Amino acid sequence: MSHQADNKLTLRRDGFTFKQFFVAHDRCAMKVGTDGILLGAWAPLSSVTRILDIGSGSGLLALMLAQRSDTHVRIDAVELDSAASQQAKENISASPWADRIAVYAEDIIDFADTRSADYSLIISNPPYFPPGIACGSAEREQARYTTLLTHETLLRCAHQLLMPDGLFCVVLPIQVAENFIPLAQQHNWYVHQQLRVSEQEDKPAHRVLLALSRQKKECVNASLAIRDEERRYSTAFQQLTKDFYLFM
């Protein structure tokens, strides 16, 4: 039996195994998924010195950015849910970057009110559904719905904490982004980069990754298909995520 097959048989079932770290997510309302992995692999890191992950959940984005960034870069992860923040701490403690990432179990509004604008990159995989159909648990509803963290609050807190030349990166469903972008512009944000993601080359985009700036810059637009027309992972998707996916 091949070494790769051996690895497949021993993968843990309570989380997600990446090439350089493991993310347990059994105590988190929102599990590791393609949206977060795309955002963590794509977010621009040029000249980054300090990073903030808002709504960190299991710590996925903080860990991905720690792997991608220089050793001097420090990362703060803020997560309101106590069970998720504890699991993020455990995931980070077990990773190679435990000394570079700090987890804060608090509301981002309170966090922003006690910090200065010294983050060069802020990243978030935010809730995107308005209150509606129940999710089955209060924790999952908190993670999925904008009840506790509205997009307006998210934009305001990020604006408060970001350095003037920094970037704020999010991933959203296309339909949600259609409302999010005008709202961001009302709060003095400018779209600097935009990656429209489709599930397959012949399908319309269903997600968008945004890099917002406090300064007006030329917007760079791009697109990415996760799979080709034969349902294989596309070359572009493999290139973007190959440092993370175990068998990519």
UniProtKB/Swiss-Prot annotation:
<keyword id="KW-0949">S-adenosyl-L-methionine</keyword>
<dbReference type="GO" id="GO:0005737">
    <property type="term" value="C:cytoplasm"/>
</dbReference>
<dbReference type="InterPro" id="IPR007848">
    <property type="entry name" value="Small_mtfrase_dom"/>
</dbReference>
<dbReference type="GO" id="GO:0032259">
    <property type="term" value="P:methylation"/>
</dbReference>
<comment type="similarity">
    <text>Belongs to the methyltransferase superfamily. tRNA (adenine-N(6)-)-methyltransferase family.</text>
</comment>
<keyword id="KW-0489">Methyltransferase</keyword>
<dbReference type="GO" id="GO:0008033">
    <property type="term" value="P:tRNA processing"/>
</dbReference>
<comment type="function">
    <text>Specifically methylates the adenine in position 37 of tRNA(1)(Val) (anticodon cmo5UAC).</text>
</comment>
<keyword id="KW-0819">tRNA processing</keyword>
<dbReference type="GO" id="GO:0016430">
    <property type="term" value="F:tRNA (adenine-N6)-methyltransferase activity"/>
</dbReference>
<dbReference type="InterPro" id="IPR022882">
    <property type="entry name" value="tRNA_adenine-N6_MeTrfase"/>
</dbReference>
<dbReference type="InterPro" id="IPR029063">
    <property type="entry name" value="SAM-dependent_MTases_sf"/>
</dbReference>
<protein>
    <recommendedName>
        <fullName>tRNA1(Val) (adenine(37)-N6)-methyltransferase</fullName>
        <ecNumber>2.1.1.223</ecNumber>
    </recommendedName>
</protein>
<dbReference type="InterPro" id="IPR050210">
    <property type="entry name" value="tRNA_Adenine-N(6)_MTase"/>
</dbReference>
<dbReference type="Pfam" id="PF05175">
    <property type="entry name" value="MTS"/>
</dbReference>
<dbReference type="InterPro" id="IPR002052">
    <property type="entry name" value="DNA_methylase_N6_adenine_CS"/>
</dbReference>
<dbReference type="GO" id="GO:0003676">
    <property type="term" value="F:nucleic acid binding"/>
</dbReference>
<keyword id="KW-0963">Cytoplasm</keyword>
<keyword id="KW-0808">Transferase</keyword>
